[in-house]
Structures are given as structure tokens and as C-alpha cells.
UniProtKB/Swiss-Prot annotation:
Residue intervals passing through the bilayer: none
Species: Sulfolobus acidocaldarius (strain ATCC 33909 / DSM 639 / JCM 8929 / NBRC 15157 / NCIMB 11770)
Signal sequence coordinates: none
Keywords, in A-Z order: DNA damage, DNA repair, Endonuclease, Exonuclease, Hydrolase, Manganese, Metal-binding, Nuclease
Known cofactor(s): Mn(2+)
UniProt name for this protein: DNA double-strand break repair protein Mre11
Regulation of protein activity: Nuclease activity is regulated by Rad50.
Catalytic residues (UniProt): 85 (proton donor)
């Protein structure tokens, strides 16, 4: 029996406020549904963030309805949990998935005691629980005991092993309940898989499109798409199926030789982009000569015929003066007094005047400070 695992589709997301990027997200979802139909899977499991927000735009809801109807026409159930993006932010709100469930297009699993039986495979799921309710999450996980080894647990949570940053994770691998053969996880946008003791598999499908520039490096290595899961053996096996998405690249432009650098970027775009869609370009500025913003923006317009959108991702320009100062600070000065002395001499103070000023700064005795001030002013007591 084969299942298709997808996650973090973020329908309705309008990256960089571009209509073309919103359409890209819809196109990617259509490709995922095509894969499910073409592979004749038993079901699709979606591990959270079907929508980008809890109140998605009408276009996003309409696209979801159209594509999910295609699945239903092929008798392929769509089993999902909610993620942090599409979960309600107020108690009186509902999951947008509930509207789809009302029309029998999907089955949403909200708590751990919800489950779906697919032939001899049990699918459990728990929708996203935030940091403030992490104890409730751990309690729910501690109570679940699958009735069969061929069982799947769907989660949309930060796991410390994969998101080891303060506030980014809610559970550790040790919090996962025992007895499942597959833990299908959403939330992380890059593909991952790990085997636990006993052969159980943690499988992270990742987002099927590039939602943040931090995902570009991993996309270039592992691509994006869906995970085909074969549950027919004693342990699950997986196979990645990629989708065709708009490329995104991070490239340097050196402002010291900006025309030449832009021409080099254009050449790289021609060589590396094989997609029919123009790419998104994230620019890292390099160089040592500051450039006026209006001049920079005018020069960058040469890229417009080759990219869908470009943006300054990082500004790494460091002027020669700044670089020299940093080098001097690292190699020349042994103390704060040396830095102050160098500055004072640089603006015209004599060695003697510089010494007096530094003595005034360092002196704690008020009477001695008064004497030094008089000496500096040339009005010492006779």
C-alpha cells in the first residue's frame, strides 16, 4: 500500500507581495495532486500548514476545493492535521480545513485520539500545539498506544534535533510515543529522514516550494516535492518525487565593478536556470566603495529581463576606511587609552595635551581632576 506525504503547502502565500508567487504556490499544489493520482496512492497525508494563514484568501480556498475534488473523484482520501500557520489565533475561530471537511473533501485529525484506518494501517494525528501548551502536547503523546505496528503518527511540531533554537522546538525525539513505524512530520521546510531504534522512520516531507531564502541551499541539494511511502513491507520505505518550481538563487554583485559584476550575474542566470519561469534573485552586495542607492537601483534594472524579481538580501559593503579602522583596532591598539590618544592627536592635540586629557578621564579623585583641568587650561595655582 502506498501513501503520498506532503506538507507545508501554504496556499495563499504571496511571497514578496508578488501575484506570480501566489500562483506558483497553487501550481505546485496542483502538481502534488497530479502525483497522487498518477501514482494511484491509497491516500494523501498532509502534515500541516495547508494554508498560509488561518483566514486564507478566497482564491486559496477555491483552488484547494478544485484540487481536492479531483482527489475525491479518484477515491483518494486526504488526511491532514493543522499547522501553526493555519491554526486559529482566537478560541472562537475554527480551522479553515473544517470547511473542506464539511464537504467531505478532507479528514482533519485534531487530537491524538483521532485516527483513520487504511486497510491494515492506522493513521494518527495531532494538529499543531503552541509553546504555551507544550505540557498538553506531551501528555497527549504519552497516552497514545497504536494497536498495530503498521501505524503512522502525523505531527506539526518543532523537534529539538532539527530546530535546536530557543523557542523553536516543543518536543524532543524522546517525547515521541513508541510503537509507530512512521512519524510523518511537518513544520520544517527541508526534506529529512532518520531511523530510530527498532527501525521506525521519521520522515519530514518539507515544503514543496521555496517559502524562505534560507531554504535555497537545501533545495539545490535535495529539491522539493512529495514523499511516496510504501507501507507494504515490515517497515516503511520512501521515495522522493520532485515538483517543478520557480528557481531562486543567491548571487553576489560587487559594487566596485558593478557593470561587470551584473553582466556576470546575467551570464550565470542564463547558464543555471533551466526552468521556463524566470527566477527570483537574492543579491548579496560586496565591495569597498560605497554606492548611492539611486545609482545602485538604476544599474540593477539591467536584471529585469532575466528575473521575475530581485531584492537586496545582504549588504556586505565595507569601505576601505572602515576596513582599515577595523584592522588598526585589531592590530595596533593594546588599550582604550591608545585609541583615545590616537584620535586626539588626529584632530590636533599635542602629546602633552593628549596625556592630560587621558589622565583626566582615568582619574577618580575630584581634587586631582580639578588640578589637571587647571593645568590643561593653563591656569595652574602658583
Amino acid at each position: 500500500m502506498q501513501l503520498l506525504h506532503i506538507s507545508d503547502t501554504h496556499l495563499g502565500k504571496r511571497q514578496y507581495n508578488l501575484e506570480s508567487r501566489e500562483k506558483d504556490v497553487y501550481d505546485t499544489f496542483t502538481q502534488l495532486i497530479d502525483i497522487a493520482i498518477n501514482e494511484h496512492v491509497k491516500a494523501v497525508i498532509h502534515t500541516g500548514d495547508l494554508f498560509d494563514v488561518n483566514n486564507p484568501p478566497n482564491r486559496a480556498k477555491l483552488h484547494a476545493i478544485k484540487e481536492l475534488k479531483r482527489l475525491k473523484d479518484h477515491n483518494i482520501p486526504f488526511i491532514c492535521i493543522a499547522g501553526d500557520h493555519d491554526s486559529p489565533k482566537r478560541k472562537e475561530e475554527i480551522y479553515p480545513q473544517r470547511i473542506l471537511e464539511e464537504f467531505n473533501l478532507i479528514k482533519i485529525l485534531q487530537k491524538i485520539d483521532n485516527r483513520v484506518k487504511l486497510e491494515n494501517v492506522e493513521v494518527y494525528g495531532i494538529s499543531h500545539i503552541s509553546n504555551v501548551s507544550v505540557n498538553d502536547l506531551k501528555e497527549q503523546l504519552s497516552k497514545v498506544k497504536p494497536e498495530t505496528r503498521k501505524s503512522i503518527l502525523m505531527l506539526h511540531q518543532g523537534i529539538r534535533t532539527y530546530l535546536p533554537y530557543q523557542g523553536a522546538w516543543q518536543i524532543e525525539l524522546s517525547d515521541l510515543p513508541k510503537g509507530f513505524s512512521l512519524y510523518a512530520v511537518g513544520h520544517l521546510h527541508s526534506r529529512r529522514k532518520d531511523y530510530l531504534d527498532g527501525g521506525a522512520l521519521i520522515e519530514i516531507a518539507g515544503s514543496p516550494d521555496i517559502m524562505r531564502e534560507e531554504e535555497i541551499e537545501d533545495y539545490q541539494k535535495s529539491k522539493k516535492g512529495a514523499t511516496l511511502i510504501d507501507m507494504s513491507g515490515d517497515l516503511p520505505s520512501i521515495n522522493y518525487i520532485n515538483v517543478n518550481i520557480r528557481d531562486q538563487l543567491v548571487l553576489d554583485i560587487n559594487v566596485d565593478k558593478i557593470e561587470q559584476s551584473i553582466e556576470s550575474v546575467i551570464q550565470k542566470l542564463k547558464e543555471n536556470v533551466k526552468n521556463d519561469k524566470k527566477p527570483i534573485l537574492h543579491i548579496e552586495l560586496e565591495g569597498t566603495v560605497p554606492i548611492r542607492k539611486d545609482v545602485l537601483m538604476t544599474k540593477l534594472q539591467a536584471l529585469r529581463d532575466y528575473v521575475e524579481h530581485y531584492r537586496i538580501y545582504k549588504n556586505n559593503i565595507v569601505s576601505i576606511k572602515e576596513e582599515n579602522l577595523k584592522t588598526k583596532l585589531k592590530t595596533t591598539y593594546s588599550s582604550l587609552n591608545d585609541i583615545i590618544a590616537d584620535y586626539l592627536k588626529g584632530i590636533g592635540y599635542t602629546d602633552e595635551e593628549t596625556k592630560i586629557i587621558i589622565d583626566i578621564i582615568n582619574e577618580e579623585d575630584e581634587k586631582k581632576v580639578e588640578e589637571l583641568l587647571k593645568k590643561f587650561a593653563g591656569v595652574e595655582d602658583k
